[in-house]
Amino acid sequence: MTQAIKEIFKTKIYGIIREDDPEKAYEIANAYKEGGIKVIEINSGIDAIKKIAQIEDIYVAQGGIITSEQAHKGIEAGAKLLVSPILQMGLTKVSSASKIPLILSATTPNEAYSAWKVRVPIIKIFPIKDLGCSTYIEDLLRPMRFLNVMPCGSVKIEHIRPLLNAGACAVGMVRGLYLGKSYDETVKLTKEAVSEAQKA
C-alpha cells in the first residue's frame, strides 16, 4: 500500500479540485493542505498537476483519466495516484507497470465488485447524491463488506459521518469546500470536514 492510499484511509477525506486555472487550483490545494487534506485529485490538466506536485507533503491524484496516454502524461507530471471516472479496466496495466495506484469508479454493485477483482485499493462510488447517499452505501456493502468504497459527488459536510458510518473508507469532497469561498474559508471548511471524518 502506497503512502497516498494510507493517507486517504487515515484522513478519510479526499480533496478534489475542478478548476481550469492552474494558479487557482494551486491556491486551493494549499488551503486543503492547511486544513488537513494531503491527497488531492486534480481535474484541471497537466500544468496544474506539475505545479501542485511541488507542494511538500501533498500527494497529487490525476483525475478524469479515460486513456492510457492520459495516465502516462499524469505520471510524468508527478501524479502519485491515477483516478478514472469510469470502470476503465485498461488502466490497470499502466498502474501495474508504473507502480502508481489506481482508483476506478463504479455506480452499480457489479461494477464495484469488478473493480475489487482487479485489486483496485479504493473504489470511487459516483455520483453518490443521485444514488441515495448513505443508504446506498449500506445496501452496497451489506453483501460485500470487503470493498473499500469512497463516495463522491455533491457531498456536503453533513453527509460525511453518515457515509463513513455506513461503511465508506473515505469521502470525496469537491466544490463545496472552495467554490465561492476565500482561502481562509476553504481552510476552515476543510478542517471541519477532516474533524467530522475523525468522529465517525
Model-derived regions, located:
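Short catalytic-loop micro-motif centered on adjacent basic/acidic residues
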Residues: 38-41, 82-83, 124-125, 150
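Glycine-rich phosphate-binding active-site loops on the catalytic face of alpha/beta enzymes
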Residues: 80-91, 124-133, 166-189
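A charged, well-structured terminal subsegment
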Residues: 138-143, 187
